[in-house]
Design a protein with these regions (language model features):
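Short secondary-structure boundary/hinge segments and terminal tails
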Residues: 53, 114-115
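Short loop/helix-cap segments at secondary-structure boundaries that form the rim of catalytic
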Residues: 51-57, 74
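Flexible, polar/low-complexity N-terminal or interdomain linker segments that lie immediately upstream
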Residues: 1-41, 45-53
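Conserved small-residue
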Residues: 43-44, 59, 97
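Short acidic-hydrophobic, aromatic-tinged amphipathic segments that line or gate anion-handling sites
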Residues: 62-63
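Catalytic cysteine-centered active loop of the rhodanese-like fold, especially the PTP/DSP P-loop
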Residues: 68-114
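Short acidic active-site motifs
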Residues: 31-32, 66-70
């Protein structure tokens, strides 16, 4: 039995889209705005180059690839809002921060989705 290569490509693309959706789990915009207004630490997990190219006002840059070794830059006693370019890296960062003991962390998605 042979499978049509087109069907395999479509199935792979659908799996990738589903994975991205499951990984991103972006917080509602109203919740993100509320947390920022209440004084949340806003963390940009994009690369330093991306950050220099434009960032959310007041955000700190802790690239995802060094986040686990730079946790001391993010206070634990305040809410944390994390963003990246699309929401995928920030979703990974949220999981990492929660495993590290951060309680109030949310994924804002991409930079252009912030209030």
């Amino acid at each position: 039995m042979q499978l049509d290569p087109t069907i395999l490509v479509i199935a792979a693309a659908a799996a990738i889209l589903l994975l991205k959706l499951l990984l991103s789990r972006r917080a509602p915009a109203a919740l993100v705005a509320e947390k920022i207004k209440a004084g949340a630490t806003v963390v940009d997990v994009r690369s330093e180059g991306e950050f220099r190219g434009g960032a959310y006002r007041g955000a700190i840059n802790v690239p995802l690839q060094v986040l686990s070794s730079k946790l001391d830059r993010i206070p634990k006693g305040r809410p944390v809002v994390v963003y990246c370019a699309s929401g995928s890296r920030s979703a990974m960062a949220v999981r990492l921060l929660k495993k590290a003991g951060y309680q109030d962390v949310c994924n804002a998605g991409g930079l252009h989705q912030l209030p």
